[in-house]
């Protein structure tokens, strides 16, 4: 169940070690980098105005039981930052997957799964390709979206 709160004050909302899975999509860009969004809510969502990778992983560490899993998506240029911070908080990166729009394109996102208290071993999985050359979803993306994909491709063309 999604819960909206300030993750920097997560202890005010939840007890420590109360979850076996935590997922996060933290802001991608440090403040004062790239083109900052004009709207305040978009700026907060995209830039590390209110939280950063360290805040996100620290909150996940607090929430996770020993052996619990942490999943996060982020931009490839922040990969080293994310993996370093995960290890700093004893969440060992276990699976890594890059995401690209079409085959043979540079990834625009990565998905990482870590396990609290685990031993080192990172498995890099095949790249997740979103679209076929004709612009339609790949079979794997159709599996991900399921019935939500019905008619979506026609709306974006």
Predicted segments, located by residue:
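SAM/dcSAM-binding transferase cores
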Residues: 106-157
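Structural signature of beta-strand start/N-cap positions in the alpha/beta core
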Residues: 1, 18-20
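Conserved Class I SAM-dependent methyltransferase catalytic core
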Residues: 49-107, 111
């Amino acid at each position: 169940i999604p819960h909206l709160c300030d993750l920097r004050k997560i202890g005010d909302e939840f007890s420590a070690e109360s979850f076996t899975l935590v997922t996060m999509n933290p802001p991608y860009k440090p403040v004062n980098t790239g083109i900052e969004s004009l709207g305040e809510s978009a700026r907060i969502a995209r830039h590390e105005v209110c939280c950063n990778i360290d805040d996100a992983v620290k909150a996940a560490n607090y929430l996770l039981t020993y052996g619990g899993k942490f999943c996060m998506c982020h931009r490839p240029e922040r990969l080293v930052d994310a993996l370093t911070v995960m290890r700093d908080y004893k969440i060992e990166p276990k699976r890594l997957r890059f995401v690209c729009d079409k085959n043979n394109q540079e990834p625009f996102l990565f998905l990482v799964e870590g396990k609290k208290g685990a031993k080192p071993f990172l498995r890099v999985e095949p790249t997740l390709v979103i679209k076929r050359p004709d612009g339609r979803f790949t079979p794997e993306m159709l599996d991900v979206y399921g019935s939500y994909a019905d008619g979506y491709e026609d709306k974006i063309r």
